[in-house]
């Protein structure tokens, strides 16, 4: 099994292996196999479109968790310039599961904040698997307040399996840190654009998710709980995660239908990890368009629209 491909993608992986083998044979034996390779590549593209046209909610969750999926730093490096990371919550510690700092988007100053996961074992431990402790949320709020002081817009990138549930986090008042962020973000007199780029799970996502616009990548998910957590509670078995994912309505299409997100950003064929540069360029265009629109509004209009927007959730 090719680990770069998920279980439902294995037919694609097998065809890609044949393409790679043909290329190797053509190169090593100096045979022109271009026509055969092109035919197989077209067949592979058709197969990929067929599989991805009918994904289940659980398969989308798998894509959101793909180990090669772009993380916050991948987008920062491609979308923004002059990024200057800011550290610490000024209360307890640095909190590496959330990163943030000043940057420029097409020359305009912005404050970028997002969850960061790791790729290697050491990075995953350092980033706490993208699960923020209270100091992470407090750091994020400190940076947002700093941005407000200088009238700089805030852009958040959400990608977390949830807030860290450890004893230490609870002792340092995890729930208060999340609630404080919700309260304060609702009142910031600057534009806030939130984008779910991967996992958007529970309070850990919402703690940097209160804004004027909520964007979502096509194969990300946004939910009050993970499918496995929901299945363990309702069915006493994580094996029911597929049913839970469907019931939670956590996909971008379903959330857009419910009016809980504003835009769905299409991903490259096969997911964002298949072409990170193209995905970043598309995200950049959406961020710039929304930022231009929001910057034309007064602070009072931003607050009024934000208030009405969040008050309307769940009414229909």
Curated annotation (Swiss-Prot):
Its EC number is 2.1.3.15. The keyword rRNA processing does not apply. Gene3D superfamilies: 2-enoyl-CoA Hydratase, Chain A, domain 1. One of its GO terms (cellular component) is acetyl-CoA carboxylase complex. It holds the Pfam family ACCA. GO terms for biological process: fatty acid biosynthetic process; malonyl-CoA biosynthetic process. It comes from the Bacteria. The keyword Metal-binding does not apply. It catalyses: N(6)-carboxybiotinyl-L-lysyl-[protein] + acetyl-CoA = N(6)-biotinyl-L-lysyl-[protein] + malonyl-CoA. Pathway: Lipid metabolism; malonyl-CoA biosynthesis; malonyl-CoA from acetyl-CoA: step 1/1. HAMAP family: AcetylCoA_CT_alpha (MF_00823). Component of the acetyl coenzyme A carboxylase (ACC) complex. First, biotin carboxylase catalyzes the carboxylation of biotin on its carrier protein (BCCP) and then the CO(2) group is transferred by the carboxyltransferase to acetyl-CoA to form malonyl-CoA. Acetyl-CoA carboxylase is a heterohexamer composed of biotin carboxyl carrier protein (AccB), biotin carboxylase (AccC) and two subunits each of ACCase subunit alpha (AccA) and ACCase subunit beta (AccD). Belongs to the AccA family. This is Acetyl-coenzyme A carboxylase carboxyl transferase subunit alpha.
């Amino acid at each position: 099994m090719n680990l770069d491909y998920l279980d439902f993608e294995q037919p694609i992986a097998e065809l890609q292996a044949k393409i790679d083998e043909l290329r190797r044979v053509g190169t090593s034996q100096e045979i022109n196999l271009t026509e055969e390779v092109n035919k197989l590549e077209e067949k592979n593209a058709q197969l990929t479109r067929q599989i991805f046209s009918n994904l289940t909610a659980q398969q989308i969750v798998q894509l959101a968790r793909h180990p090669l999926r772009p993380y916050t730093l991948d987008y920062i490096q491609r979308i923004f310039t002059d990024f200057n990371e800011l550290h610490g919550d000024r209360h307890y510690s640095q909190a590496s599961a959330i990163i943030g700092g000043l940057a420029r988007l097409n020359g305009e100053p912005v404050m970028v904040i997002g969850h960061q996961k790791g790729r290697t074992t050491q990075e995953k431990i350092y980033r706490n698997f993208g699960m923020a402790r209270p100091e992470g949320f407090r750091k994020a709020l400190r940076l947002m307040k700093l941005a407000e002081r200088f009238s700089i817009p805030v852009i958040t990138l959400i990608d977390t399996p949830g807030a860290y549930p450890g004893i230490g986090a609870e002792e340092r008042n995890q729930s208060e840190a999340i609630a404080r962020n919700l309260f304060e973000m609702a009142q910031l007199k600057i534009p806030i654009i939130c984008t779910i780029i991967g996992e958007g799970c529970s309070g850990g996502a919402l703690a940097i998710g209160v804004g004027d616009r909520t964007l979502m990548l096509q194969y990300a998910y946004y939910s009050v709980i993970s499918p496995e957590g929901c299945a363990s509670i309702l069915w006493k078995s994580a094996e029911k995660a597929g049913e839970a994912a469907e019931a939670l309505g956590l996909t971008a299409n379903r959330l857009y239908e419910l009016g809980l997100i504003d835009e769905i950003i299409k991903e490259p064929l096969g997911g964002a990890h298949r072409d990170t540069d193209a995905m970043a360029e598309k995200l950049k265009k959406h961020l710039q368009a929304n930022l231009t629109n929001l910057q034309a509004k007064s602070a009072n209009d931003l607050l009024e629209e934000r208030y009405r927007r969040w008050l309307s959730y769940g009414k229909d």
